[in-house]
């Protein structure tokens, strides 16, 4: 069986702290997988890393056969890798355009509309 999502040695470091330390994960296509652990264990950081909201320090992630390491969050969403959030918020490290694209339905039409909107408000 092929895997829809795989990570190999995925590491996220904040300062000197490894929030995720060389995580290997394989999710078979068509299967559900739960990620459980105590507060502060790195579950949300891991999800943020594979969806592109925090940069990885090492390792790689492959979704549906393609390396997603260089993709922006909205590009990962367009490929089908999406998530829900614990709270509604803007992402301070993303531009206004990228924040809008994260929320947009994954089509070129919405990218076009977001570009038009941002040009109208001069952002």
PLM features per residue range, with description:
Residues 36-38:
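The feature captures the beta-strand-to-loop junction immediately N-terminal to the Walker
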Residues 17-18, 75:
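Short coil-to-beta microelement around the adenine-binding A-loop and adjacent beta1/P-loop entry
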Residues 121-123:
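Conserved small/polar residues in nucleotide/adenosyl-binding loops
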Residues 51:
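Helix-to-loop junction immediately C-terminal to a conserved catalytic motif
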Residues 59-67, 79:
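Conserved ABC transporter NBD signature motif
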Residues 94-116:
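Short coil-to-helix segment of the ABC ATPase nucleotide-binding domain corresponding to the Q-loop/switch region
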